Amino acid sequence: MKTVKKETIIEFEEKKSKFIGYIKPVSTVAEAEKFIDSIKQMHPNATHNVPLYRVMENGQEYFKYNDDGEPSNTAGKPMAEILNILDVYNVAIVATRYFGGIKLGAGGLIRNYAKTAKLAVNEAEITEYVEKSIFILDYDYEYTSEMEAFLNGNSQKFGIEILEKNYSNRVTMKISANDEIEKELNSLQKIIVIKM
């Protein structure tokens, strides 16, 4: 199964319409929907924010898209077809369009929304999907800089994403990462590691 390596943004203009493509690798439907909502909030005045996600979660495929007010099947569907052609999963995309005053027609919309998805996927780089797990890390405040250095230094290697940080008597952090990180985490001193 293939996905994309990184979150990224692409942008281009077509007949004065501005297209911005946002893409992010995701592991769950909830993560995809949160990403889509965050992009819509960034562009509340956009003419259209066309959402799309394709997620394999617990052995079930969730593939959802819509046209966000564009004529039927001229926005979400051509973007979805790009994911089918490239065989990419566990990804969320939002194509934001600002209308520039010149109508593109159905064919122009189809081409440009497909182009947005294709450019975004290519820029985010297709890679083999690696299953991620959730880890809870618990440690004393005095190890905060050491833990942050470890997580930052290994972010790419293990695909680390910090989901939550809580500071009370101790620091508790919830992360998503490739399973290979577990051995490294367990070798660290003075840290409690729980794999969810």
PLM feature segments, named:
Residues Y139-F158, E182-E184:
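Short amphipathic alpha-helix segments
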Residues M1-N73, S155, I162-E164, S187-L188, ...:
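C-terminal regulatory domains involved in ligand/effector binding and gene-expression control
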Residues G108-I110:
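Conserved structured catalytic cores and adjacent interaction surfaces
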Residues I160-N178:
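Non-DNA-binding regulatory cores of transcription-related proteins
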Residues F63, E70-A106:
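Ordered, amphipathic secondary-structure segments that act as subunit-interaction surfaces
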Residues V4-T8, A117-E123, A149-E161:
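Short amphipathic beta-strand starts and helix->beta connectors
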Residues T127-Y141, V171-I175:
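Short glycine-/aliphatic-rich beta-strand segments at the starts of folded cytosolic domains
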Residues A114-K132:
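Long, charge-dense
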